[in-house]
Amino acid sequence: KEITSAFRVIDITQNKLSAFVAIQLDMLDLGPVFLDAYIRRCLLEALACGLEDGIVNGTGLNQPIGLIRDIHDGVSYSTTTGYPAKTKIAVTDFTPKTYGGLVAQLAQTERGNMRRVGKIVLLVNPVDYYNKIVPATTVMGSDGLYRADVLPVPTQIIQTTALKSGDAVLFLPDEYKLLAGGRRSGSIEYSDEYKFLEDMRYFKIKQHATGKCFDNTCALYLNIANLEELYVTVKQVEAPTV
């Protein structure tokens, strides 16, 4: 049978993400090795937080297209606000029927074709993880020990500060493409010229990147505000009469 698929052409425009920090030159007296490690750690953390927020919430306007954005064919793109957010799916439990239905949506492309589901990730903020996810995914085994993050379909649960309370994202990480240019951990530069008279040195880190989902069904935007606690249902069965 003739293969009917073809190459897909995607317009990619990378955006610049940068962060900076200023220090007094007198701080070099603390030790250049210590100060260098401290500044690099701060700048790398700032860069990581910026990328994380862009991957989750990015509007596509001078930033990546985030997982929560609606990118279906024909969606209205605003030149001032970018792509709109997806409509949230209310989820009150993680029973096999409910959770299987969510994963089934990921298994179908926007054009209606079937897609193999490999790795699945659930994003939640740290507070919701302990208040909502832990009660809904923790069970006690026959040995008296608790098993956490138990879901009907194997899923990696990742905490992120980029989501608001009550929100969650279920997505296929292999279907989100983050395209970064330049050095993997960003490029760090410094200058003493900006505030020369104040004896201040500025350090800057920058990274060029963009990202988007393959299509609109690679990620689901969930409302877990009313997620219920998991209860193990025990059914009593009468023993047969001998």
Predicted regions and their residues:
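N-terminal glycine-rich phosphate/pyrophosphate-binding loop and immediately adjacent elements
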Residues: 213
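Extended oligomerization regions of viral-like shell subunits
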Residues: 61-207, 231-242
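Extended active-site and interfacial segments that coordinate phosphate-rich ligands
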Residues: 1-4, 222-228
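Acidic/polar, low-complexity extended loops/arms that serve as protein-protein interfaces
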Residues: 1-99
